[in-house]
Amino acid sequence: VNPFRASMILGTPGSGKSYAVVNNYIKQAIEKSYALYIYDFKFDDLSVIAYNHLIKYRHRYKIPPKFYVINFDNPRKSHRCNPLAPELMTDISDAYESSYTIMLNLNKSWVQKQGDFFVESPIVLFTAIIWFLKIYEGGKFCTFPHAIELLNKRYEDVFTILTSYPDLENYLSPFIDAWKGGASEQLQGQIASAKIPLSRLISPQLYWVMSGSDFTLDINNPKEPKVLCVGNNPDRISIYGAALGLYNSRIVKLINKKKQLKSCVIIDELPTIFFKGLDNLIATARSNKVAVVLGFQDFSQLKRDYGDKEAAVIMSTVGNVFSGQVVGETAKTLSERFGKILQKRESMSINRNDTSTSINTQLDSLIPASKISTLSQGMFVGAVADNFGETIEQKIFHAQIVVCLLYTSPSPRDS
């Protein structure tokens, strides 16, 4: 099975997708010396598995990776990392991407309204603030907390400072025109649409974690491999999700490069976070040895939070599919993906004089939607992708995934 063609794990709550598939992806990735990035929605469920397995198998790496955790709930047990580090941004488009990611994670309804005036305005304004911090005194204050604090100053003072830089004067021309033209109500509405969502992120914990630099986000750097776990909290999804989305977008750009270690990106409960660039990562990361694993409950969740177009791209470009029980349109879509099979049907008719038998053939679904919607816990259907020269004849499966709970000692050759 080729993991670099991306994997999708679906199933309703309790179907066993994390226990049977996601957990084993983590274990096998570590056993095969991958650099690892894990989005742990219910922290620390996946992080504990990764940490314990890394201790057991770290000898398999040429350079043992370091284990890092980002945990906003308990900063004392979290490492610090600045996702807006100035060295990561070479152009104002990098600042725009960061601003875009934050805003869409804070306002998921904006995903469907990209390009609208009151969507683009706050993104452009926050972009200018990030880029100012990047070019001011060599990026000394270029952190996410500094950007939020600067945004919340009086807009007259902020615009006076920003427009003193030629790089930003033209970029902010719509705001400056409104300011000088006396359209204060419109201007205040534009600024408020940036301030109000970002004010939810004003937190000592977030500020502390996102202003330090204990490590860099290039997890598959051959000289400094890493296993990075970022933890969310189901009770604070809307707050932590925006901050973690910024880490995600940075990591996607840094790991999808040539001459790096093979790596694995595991995103459990994908719809809880807006992962900018995910469709492009799936489509292009195979040649750079990046395995992407996405766990979510069904396609309707994905369409709701990512929009129809991006969800369709993600669903159609993933090569490996593992599905527990799903219902409705998701079950129908999977049934169509698995294809049809030619089956013989025999019918018999009986009347007073004789009995006749007829045999015909008909194309039926290989795995009907009705069967997918009634799968028991631990039972999965799916399709796998193979490699050139390593053909898998039976790509479609319907089986129980058996998880081995016994600890197997490393073989002597691994010591």
Tell me the role of every PLM-derived stretch.
Residues 3-290, 306, 371-392, 406, ...:
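P-loop NTPase motor domains
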Residues 44, 75, 300-301, 329:
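Surface-exposed, flexible loop/turn segments at secondary-structure boundaries
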Residues 117-123, 280, 303-409, 413-415:
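P-loop NTPase motor core of the ASCE superfamily
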Residues 292-294:
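Long, positively charged, glycine-interspersed low-complexity recognition regions
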Residues 297:
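Conserved H-loop
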